[in-house]
Design a protein with these regions (language model features):
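Conserved Walker B catalytic segment
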Residues: 1-40, 45-49
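Conserved small helical "lid"/interfacial subdomain of P-loop NTPases
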Residues: 57-85, 91-92, 103
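Winged-helix-like regulatory helical subdomains adjacent to P-loop NTPase cores
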Residues: 101-179, 226-232
Length: 258
C-alpha cells in the first residue's frame, strides 16, 4: 500500500535510487505483487518505461448501482426514491468512495432524527467540524506536503478556488510570478493530482476539494450562509433534473442565496 512512500528513504546515503531499485527487483521476481498509490501521475511516470509485467489498473469511481448498495433501500420510501437518492449522492460525491460513504452515513443519521436529503447532508459534512471538511483538509495538506513550493502551490489553489479554467498566463498574472515559474508550480500540483489541465486550462482534479478550499482556506470559519451558498453553487449543476428544489430548500433554511 502506498509504495511510492519508499521515496522517504532517498535522503539516506546509498538509497537515492531505492524506489527505482525496488521496481527493478520486483520486475525480475517470479512472484506477483499488488502495489497501490493515491498518486496516479507519479505512478504512471515511474512505470512508463518499465517491464511489460506491470499492469496499471485505475480504480473507477462508484456507479449509481454501487452507491445504491451503500446508501441502502432504508434511506428512501420506495425503490424509485432510493434510486434518485443514490443518483444524487453519486453526483455530489463525484463517485469517490470515501465521499459516498460519508454522505450515506450522514443521511442515515439525519433520517434517524426525522429526515434529511443529500444536499443538507453535504452541507453538514462540510461544516468546520464535519467529516468531509476533515477528510478534505487531510488530503489537501498531505498532497501539498508531498510536492515542492508549499506556499506558492497553496496560492494557486486559492486562485483556482475563485475561478477555474484559467490559462497559465492568467494564473501567472494573478500570482504575480513569471509564466516560467508558474508553469513549474502547476506541474508540481499536477504531479500530486491536485490539478488537471484540459486544453491548457487548469482546474481542480477533485471538484469537492475546490468547495472545501473556498470555504476553509480563508481567515475566518465559514458561516451557515457561506455553507449554504457554496453547497448550492456546487450542487445545482450536478443534481438530477427534479432535484433543484432540494437545494433551494436547504438554502432557504440556512441563509439567502444570491
Amino acid at each position: 500500500d502506498e509504495f511510492l512512500e519508499l521515496r522517504t528513504f532517498e535522503s539516506f546515503p546509498g538509497l537515492r535510487r531505492v524506489l527505482h531499485d525496488f521496481i527493478d527487483c520486483i520486475a525480475l521476481s517470479p512472484n506477483k505483487f499488488v502495489l497501490t498509490s493515491r498518486y496516479v501521475v507519479r505512478t504512471l511516470r515511474l512505470l512508463r518505461d518499465r517491464s511489460a509485467r506491470f499492469e496499471v489498473v485505475h480504480l473507477p469511481g462508484l456507479t449509481v448501482e454501487d452507491t445504491l448498495d451503500i446508501v441502502g433501500m432504508s434511506a428512501a420510501s420506495d425503490a424509485a426514491d432510493a434510486e434518485h437518492t443514490a443518483r444524487s449522492v453519486q453526483a455530489l460525491a463525484d463517485g469517490r468512495p470515501a465521499y459516498v460513504r460519508a454522505l450515506a452515513d450522514e443521511l442515515g443519521t439525519m433520517r434517524e432524527h426525522g429526515g434529511g436529503d443529500p444536499v443538507s447532508a453535504l452541507a453538514a459534512l462540510l461544516a468546520p467540524d464535519g467529516r468531509l471538511a476533515k477528510l478534505c483538509g487531510f488530503c489537501y495538506e498531505l498532497r501539498l506536503h508531498r510536492a515542492r513550493g508549499y506556499g506558492a502551490l497553496k496560492a494557486i489553489l486559492e486562485i483556482l478556488g475563485e475561478e477555474e479554467g484559467l490559462t497559465l498566463t492568467e494564473i501567472s498574472q494573478r500570482l504575480r510570478r513569471t509564466p516560467g515559474s508558474t508553469k513549474d508550480y502547476l506541474s508540481w500540483l499536477e504531479d500530486v493530482d491536485l490539478v488537471t489541465a484540459r486544453q491548457k486550462r487548469y482546474s481542480f482534479s477533485d471538484p469537492l476539494l475546490r468547495v472545501w478550499v473556498r470555504l476553509h482556506c480563508r481567515p475566518t470559519a465559514p458561516s451557515d450562509d457561506d455553507l449554504a451558498r457554496e453547497v448550492h453553487r456546487y450542487a445545482l449543476p450536478r443534481l438530477p433534473q427534479q432535484e433543484p428544489a432540494l437545494v433551494m430548500a436547504v438554502a432557504g433554511s440556512s441563509g439567502i442565496i444570491e
